[in-house]
């Protein structure tokens, strides 16, 4: 369990005295060094005092001393500056490529740390560290949530950067793709992104002033003007629907004009979705947003407050869709405007990461700070992750908090990365009395 031994060394979760080398010399750990997760020794620039002499250099850690030879460190000059070899089992004496014998010290993982770690790995409950959450200092919780919030934004920034590259350096196009993806609200997110990438913005831009043409362009590219891909209950009605026929005819003209090829309409998911989340409705809402010039990054950058962002993203549908969710099937009249919670989700998943990523790209710290300000201005999301943490004593107050908890679950809890988690650290270092009180 070498990884756990690394952890014990890094966080000094071991008795500080008495420590000795395998040949009986006293050891004092002054500084454990900087953890290296890449090639080379495990810890750089450590400081250890051996028999009263201070040594500054690298520390290498293994389960068994013989792993030194298994890993070829005796032939690698990068390990010549190792000032201490820390092992669980000292089964051999090791040598560097220069023939030197670095001091070696046996260090065991404390039983309580090992037991607590096994508890975390074996736990079926989420979060596995729930027993200590309510007793954690507020500073510990706040600092970790702040770090997780930034980590999540960094992760989303990478995804946006990939979209910018795929869009040949166009931030406006990347914003449209990001916005479209989040119009899928999870279930159809991947398909919305695929669809958005198929939209030649330069071409549809020629028809931006005509909302009917934009609808035809968007729905046609989505493959939804082919009645065969629509839910069975509306296929026959769609073919007889005048509006559907007009859209299909208009898209045929646009497809010839711009050599368009739609995506596979069978990819869209309608089953078990609420009608307001049907891709037909979401695409028409986005068409209106685009028609009104509110789907551009420049407009987002101009927003100075949460209220302005909400106004930018608020949208509805055209008259036909006020009485339809699917082609040919009438329903009770509704403007089908975004709910406040939907606008909040779009703000969290689109506006915030785009402002942060674009701010990084432009070297504009104000945009980056604005992204964090938006998260702090929004209430925490309501989902099962946030609710689970509330039940164990950690209540999310803002969207920044809820985003941090989502990051915590997906990047740490689900992957059992307890050794990289500050809550996991608190669990591991606690005594059994602390853990059970």
Predicted regions and their residues:
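N-terminal "leader" segments that precede or initiate the main folded domain
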Residues: 1-7
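N-terminal ordered "arm"
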Residues: 7-66, 79
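Short alpha-helical segments and helix-capping/turn motifs at coil-helix boundaries
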Residues: 30-32, 41-46, 66-71, 88-92, ...
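N-terminal accessory interaction module
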Residues: 44, 54-55, 60, 66-80, ...
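Short loop/turn segments at secondary-structure transitions that flank enzyme active sites
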Residues: 65-67, 90-92, 111-113, 185, ...
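Compact, glycine/acidic-enriched structural inserts
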Residues: 80-82, 86-144
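Hydrophobic, aromatic-lined core segments that form the binding pocket/scaffold
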Residues: 148-404, 417
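Acidic, carboxylate-rich catalytic segments that either coordinate divalent cations
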Residues: 391-437
């Amino acid at each position: 369990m070498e990884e756990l031994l690394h952890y014990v060394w890094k966080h000094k979760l071991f008795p500080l005295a008495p420590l000795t080398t395998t040949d009986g010399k006293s050891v004092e750990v002054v500084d454990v060094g900087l953890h290296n997760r890449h090639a080379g020794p495990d810890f750089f620039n450590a400081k250890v005092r051996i028999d009263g002499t201070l040594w500054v250099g690298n520390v290498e850690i293994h389960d068994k001393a013989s792993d030194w030879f298994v890993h070829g460190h005796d032939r690698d000059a990068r390990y010549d500056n190792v000032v201490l070899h820390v092992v669980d089992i000292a089964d051999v004496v090791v040598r560097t490529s220069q023939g030197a014998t670095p001091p070696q010290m046996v260090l065991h993982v404390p039983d309580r740390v090992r037991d607590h770690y096994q508890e975390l790995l074996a736990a079926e409950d989420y979060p596995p560290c729930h027993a200590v959450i309510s007793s954690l200092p507020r500073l510990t919780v706040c600092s970790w949530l702040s770090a997780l919030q930034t980590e999540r934004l960094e992760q989303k920034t990478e995804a946006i950067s990939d979209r910018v590259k795929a869009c040949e350096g166009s931030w406006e196009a990347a914003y449209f793709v990001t916005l479209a993806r989040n119009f899928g609200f999870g279930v159809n997110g991947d398909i919305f992104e695929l669809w958005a990438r198929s939209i030649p913005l330069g071409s549809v831009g020629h028809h931006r002033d005509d909302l009917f043409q934009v609808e035809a362009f968007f729905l046609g590219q989505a493959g939804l003007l082919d009645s065969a891909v629509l839910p069975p209950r509306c296929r026959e009605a769609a073919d007889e629907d005048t509006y559907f026929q007009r859209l299909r005819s208009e898209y045929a003209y646009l497809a010839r004009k711009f050599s368009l090829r739609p995506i596979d309409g069978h990819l869209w998911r309608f089953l078990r979705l609420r009608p307001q989340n049907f891709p037909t409705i979401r695409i028409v809402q986005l068409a209106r947003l685009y028609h009104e010039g509110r789907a551009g990054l420049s407009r987002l950058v101009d927003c100075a407050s949460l209220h302005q962002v909400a106004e930018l993203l608020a949208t509805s549908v055209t008259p036909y869709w006020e009485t339809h969710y699917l082609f040919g099937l009438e329903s009770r009249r509704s403007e089908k405007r975004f709910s406040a919670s939907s606008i909040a989700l779009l703000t969290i998943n689109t506006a915030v990461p785009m402002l942060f990523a674009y701010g990084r790209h432009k070297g504009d710290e104000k945009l980056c700070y604005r992204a964090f300000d938006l998260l702090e201005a929004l209430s925490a999301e309501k989902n099962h992750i946030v609710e689970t943490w509330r039940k164990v004593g950690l209540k999310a107050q803002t969207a920044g908090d809820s985003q941090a908890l989502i990051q915590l679950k997906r990047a740490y809890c689900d992957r059992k990365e307890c050794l990289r988690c500050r809550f996991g650290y608190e669990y591991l270092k606690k005594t059994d009395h602390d853990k059970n009180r």
